[in-house]
């Protein structure tokens, strides 16, 4: 069970969107779900995130985990992303930066946007989760092809509700 709606604290000028939601679960329980890429499709809820390709949990900053994706505006419809973990501070914060991996060389490149979850215990079994989508480091050439944010602002609120449903 969760309490209160997620509140969209948006700042489009600052090139990031921030939402928060209080979830009736410990930070450890919430973090465990976020560190499991096999749960990310359920957290997303749009059908864009399809499945984990590695089958392993996130355990450290610098780790790369791969996901199968689908988006109608992507040239291939189905594609893969390689996410590099930027922050791993169990059970307080986790963040990753999506990118691509060249199949021929395995070389990774990243687009400059980051998904970050900050968790704060607000009671014995209550956590305030703050989700930040930050695209401030996206270079101009990428911005010519992708509009930011590439989803409606309700997407982040919905993601936190899905996370709450999975944890509780």
Predicted regions and their residues:
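Hydrophobic ligand-binding cavity/cleft-lining segments
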Residues: 2-56
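Short, P/G- and charge-enriched loop/turn segments at secondary-structure junctions
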Residues: 6-8, 70-73, 103-107, 117
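A generic structural micro-feature
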Residues: 11-13, 59, 75-79, 107-111, ...
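Hydrophobic/aromatic beta-strand elements that line small-molecule binding cavities or substrate pockets
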Residues: 19-21, 80-87, 112-121
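A short, structured loop/turn motif at beta-sheet edges
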Residues: 24-28, 58-59, 86-93, 118-128, ...
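Hydrophobic pocket/interface hotspot
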Residues: 30-34, 40, 65-67, 85, ...
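Glycine-rich portal/gate segments that line the openings of hydrophobic small-molecule binding cavities
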Residues: 52-104, 165-166
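Beta-strand/loop substructures that line and gate deep hydrophobic ligand-binding cavities in soluble
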Residues: 97-154, 158
């Amino acid at each position: 069970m969760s309490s209160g709606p997620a509140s969209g604290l948006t700042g489009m000028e600052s090139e990031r969107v921030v939402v928060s939601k209080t979830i009736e679960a410990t930070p450890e329980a919430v973090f465990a779900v976020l560190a499991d890429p096999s749960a990310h499709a359920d957290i997303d809820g749009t059908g864009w995130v399809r499945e984990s390709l590695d089958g392993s949990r996130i355990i450290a900053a610098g780790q790369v985990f791969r996901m199968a994706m689908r988006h109608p505006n992507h040239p291939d419809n189905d594609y893969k992303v390689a996410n590099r973990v930027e922050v791993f501070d169990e059970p307080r914060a986790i963040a990753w930066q999506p990118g691509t991996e060249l199949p021929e060389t395995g070389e990774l490149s990243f687009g400059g946007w980051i998904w970050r979850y900050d968790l704060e215990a607000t009671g014995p079994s209550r956590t305030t989760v703050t989700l930040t989508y930050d695209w401030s480091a996206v270079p101009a050439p990428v911005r010519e092809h992708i509009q930011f944010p590439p989803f409606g602002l309700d997407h982040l609120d919905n993601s936190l509700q899905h996370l709450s449903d999975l944890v509780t």
